[in-house]
């Protein structure tokens, strides 16, 4: 039997999924289908996900992940497009980190719920810098930028 808490939880998640905004940050469980490589033989990995845009149907969300540190084993086309982000800018972070602007990660809208919401990038200058860096990244093509309304 469905209880009122379940109904309200579902309604709250439906409402949240219909009001996801560019700059919102979620802690999502991602896997290779999202373009994430899990570590230590794990199947998935929890990553902070910054919403960048939506596909034409609004079902798929494009965004960026936040990494704790830069992996300098990767080519400069990746490492040069890591923007520092501080705990002061994003209080939900446990330590200063880096926004990976070299790769748009894709997630279905159903992954986003009230339990995974962590906050937003409220500094408009920082959000503009993130988007501009994504647009300049040599590893992101125009089709990807267009798919998520970035150009």
Regions found by a protein language model. Give the residues of each.
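C-terminal terminal-subdomain/extension
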Residues: 2, 82-151
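Short, structured beta-strand/loop micro-motifs enriched in basic residues and often containing a Trp
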Residues: 2-11
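Compact nucleic-acid interaction/catalytic patches
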Residues: 36-87
């Amino acid at each position: 039997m469905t209880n009122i808490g379940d109904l309200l939880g579902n309604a709250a998640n439906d409402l949240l999924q219909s009001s996801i905004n560019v700059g919102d940050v979620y802690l999502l469980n991602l896997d290779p289908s999202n373009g994430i490589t899990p570590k230590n033989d794990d199947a998935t990995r929890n990553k902070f996900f910054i919403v960048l845009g939506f596909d034409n149907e609004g079902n798929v969300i494009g965004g960026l992940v936040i990494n704790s540190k830069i992996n300098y084993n990767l080519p400069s086309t990746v490492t040069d497009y890591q923007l520092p982000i501080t705990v002061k800018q994003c209080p939900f972070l446990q330590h200063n980190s880096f926004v990976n602007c070299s790769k748009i990660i894709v997630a279905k809208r159903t992954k986003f719920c009230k339990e995974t919401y962590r906050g937003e990038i409220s500094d408009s200058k920082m959000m503009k810098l993130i988007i501009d860096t994504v647009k300049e990244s040599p590893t992101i093509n125009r089709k990807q930028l267009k798919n998520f309304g970035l150009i």
